[in-house]
A protein has these predicted regions:
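Structural transition elements
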Residues: 210, 319, 326, 351-386, ...
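Detector for C-terminal structural segments
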Residues: 174, 216-221, 294-305, 331-367, ...
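A bilobed periplasmic-binding-protein/Venus flytrap-type ligand-binding module shared by bacterial periplasmic
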Residues: 224-230, 299-327, 344, 479-480
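Surface-exposed binding/hinge segments that line
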Residues: 91, 127, 140-190, 211, ...
Length: 559
């Protein structure tokens, strides 16, 4: 592993420092105020940020800031294609088990006191070996350790030389490149992790378009432009364009909205019941009063919202539950109007899930191949009769557990199901408690979301593979079907994309037919920016990409 910087990089830094000395300025002193004319992108994170260590970047709250600071071997473009990042190219062996990555030689870690002279060094293949082994180390306790479960660690990962990395798999996995786009797979310097220890997440050192500047917890987090960032635009200009990123931590959503309207925030993400009708028309268009001031971005989001049934009859609590009856589960699927729900509760942001579990935006999504459920109260009543509950007589009340964010959706479903003879009780739980109860099979009927970890249908269909039962895996319904498992395993070993998509669609249809879930809607990314913000755009993973963003006017909020 080499720790020396290139002459070109050293000289580029030496000249500005010399100029500052000539001007009589303290080169090492941080100015109290930023230079005039700085462009700062400002957004709010209402849930707070616990760490900036990519090893723990599990939620969108953490992924967004981590994405500005770190890079991996590969990255995803806005069309979900895997593109080079630190790796400039790669090869995959014929058997699909050996990946060889050829790295750029112009990628440097951010300047930090952990390096000799405080100057960031060049990234090597050995840094990726260290970063991957750190994620796999049980002592790290990274929630992303599962990514590398299929690695043949007897052979690698292996740094062949400074710019060549080999990764060996136990068995082929066609979605592996997509996995490597996850922020868990970011490269980190051993020196910084060892120097800061458990505090590395509060003193991050990465390679990204921005570097860490300052963090006042609960108040403000500042990133500054990485002037040595390796990526350039189509015209050869070095990215990023912005000078800084400022993240605030306003917890109240209405206050956040007001700050955005006043121009103190550049970006607002998602819908809040408190302001959706102010920003959007019922049809999902921008409120005309904001025309010329605010831009609305929407596109399919790889997120399926659903209700899940615990169908594992080996569990005593499930054995006497009416949801073990497939006809009851299907009646629930037919018993409410998804289209009406989306219009009145989501302002048509999102698409009614009238097909399978796979969302719009994935290649395997096929409304022509996978038939789902549409509102049909007569069919729901018929299924109840066939299940032995005519008009719902004798059917015990079913408890649906959710968090408060989805109370309105669940109450809508509750009301409509009552009209076909199905009585639903709604139980509201807090986020952490709710997730724990779902993972540990304590809820018979629950609301769920599945946001893609990586853009491959396998990531969704793994939720119904019998070897993935929670709490060890993501199969929260404990659905089990030998035929489904066989299709899933065949898909994992199929390199041909067209054949694999066909297998995925067969599995998706099986889930609809067996009904361990109630698909609600396929979500949409919804973003609001002021018109002076350019090039933000959106993507199906709802990743916040700021390296291309430009602002027309200037800010001074980057201290």
């Amino acid at each position: 592993m080499h720790y020396l910087c290139s002459k070109q990089k050293s000289m580029r830094r030496f000249l500005p420092a010399l100029l500052l000395l000539v001007m009589g300025l303290g080169a090492c002193k941080t100015p109290e105020k930023p230079e005039p004319g700085m462009t700062v992108f400002r957004y709010n994170e209402s849930k707070g940020i616990a760490t900036l260590d990519p090893a723990y970047a599990k939620s969108q709250t953490l992924i967004w800031p981590v994405h500005q600071l770190f890079n991996g071997l590969v990255q995803m473009d806005s069309a979900l294609n895997v593109q080079p990042s630190v790796a400039r190219r790669w090869e995959i062996s014929d058997d699909g088990r050996v990946y060889t990555f050829h790295l750029r030689d112009d990628v440097y870690f951010h300047d930090s006191r952990v390096f000799p002279g405080g100057e960031g060094r060049r990234v090597t293949a050995g840094d990726f070996v260290y970063s991957m082994e750190r994620i796999m180390d049980p002592a790290t306790a990274s929630p992303g350790a599962w990514i590398f479960n299929n690695l043949d660690t007897t052979r690698g990962p292996k740094a062949v030389n400074d710019t060549t990395l080999k990764i060996y798999l136990k068995k082929r996995f066609p979605a592996f490149l997509g996995l490597l786009t996850m922020k868990y797979c970011s490269v980190v310097p051993r020196e910084a992790v060892e120097y800061y220890g458990d505090e590395f997440g509060h003193h991050p050192v990465g390679t990204g378009p921005f570097h860490f500047k300052m963090w006042r917890e609960g108040e403000k987090l500042i990133f500054r432009k990485n002037t040595d960032y390796f990526e350039r635009d189509a015209g050869g200009n070095r990215l990023p364009y912005l000078d800084a990123v400022a993240i605030s931590f306003i917890t109240d959503k209405q206050s956040e909205f007001l700050e955005f309207i006043k121009g103190n925030l550049d970006f607002l993400s998602g819908l809040s019941p408190a302001n959706k009708d102010e920003l959007l028309t019922r049809s999902g268009q921008l409120n005309p009063k904001y025309k010329g001031e605010i831009k609305l971005y929407t596109q399919p989001y790889l997120n399926t919202e659903y209700l899940g049934f615990l169908v594992d009859t080996s569990l005593e609590k499930v054995q006497n539950s009416p949801v073990t009856n497939r006809k009851v589960r299907k009646a629930i699927n037919y018993g409410f109007d998804r289209k009406k729900m989306m219009k009145y509760l989501r302002n048509n942001i999102g698409t009614p899930a009238n097909h399978g579990f796979l969302p719009k935006g994935l290649p395997a999504f096929s409304p022509d191949s996978v038939g789902g459920y549409r509102y049909n109260p007569d069919r729901a009543r018929q299924l109840l009769r066939e299940a032995g509950y005519p008009n719902g007589e004798g059917l015990q009340e079913i408890t649906l557990t959710t968090t408060d964010d989805y109370r309105d959706l669940c109450e809508f479903i509750q009301h409509q199901l009552s009209e076909v003879g199905i009585d639903i009780a709604i139980e509201i739980s807090t986020g952490a408690t709710f997730r724990d109860m779902v993972a540990n099979s304590r809820l018979l009927f629950f609301r769920g979301s599945w946001i893609a970890d990586y853009p491959d249908s396998e990531n969704y269909l793994a939720l119904f593979y019998s070897r993935n039962f929670s709490p060890g895996g993501p199969n929260y319904t404990h659905f089990s079907n030998p035929r489904y498992d066989s299709l899933y395993e065949t898909a994992l070993n199929t390199m041909d994309p067209a054949r694999r998509q066909n297998l995925y669609r067969q599995m998706d249809q099986m889930i609809i037919d067996h009904a361990p879930i109630v698909p609600l809607y396929y979500d949409q990314v919804v973003r609001f920016t002021h018109t002076h913000v350019k090039n933000l755009g959106s993507n199906p993973m709802n990743l916040l990409v700021l390296k291309h963003v430009k602002k027309k006017h200037h800010d001074t909020d980057s201290r």
